[in-house]
Amino acid sequence: IARLLKGLDIAQLLSVVEEIPMVPDTIEVVCELKKRGYIVGVISDSYEFVAQHIKNKINADFVIANELEFSNGIATGEVKVPFYFAKTQKSRCNHNFCKSNVLLHISEKYDIPPDNIIAVGDSEYDICMLKYAGIGISFCSANQILNAIADKTINIRSFKPILDFAL
């Protein structure tokens, strides 16, 4: 996909991102989670500039995502996968690149035991992350495996039910 973006400038790409509808109560729920003392972040296998834009919009604390490379504001079509996704000796799954590895990094960085982490995901790429989080929440997912391993499942386009689990 990155090669299809080659030659486009960041302003063009962000205008497309701006058209993607967010879950309506996202900002409200993030605000409430932060009031409760939670650190809120975006871990995405999409591109960092998209995740960073969302982070800023919802006032999240961090973002970790793949880096679409730019030269003078123009996409080069190349992508860097941050080392946080890479398998290490501490990895709990066998994938070479996995969001569960990012979860371990976040756990160490913020000194939060994995059992105290709530992870929310919607695709097959979130399975390991949800599996190893304290509470794994499947959000509006059609993936049967993700739904089966999740501790909780949300089937409506609202993040408010997360507040019931985030005490």
For each feature predicted by the language model, list its residue ranges.
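C-terminal cap/substrate-recognition subdomain and adjoining C-terminal extension
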Residues: 17-42, 46-167
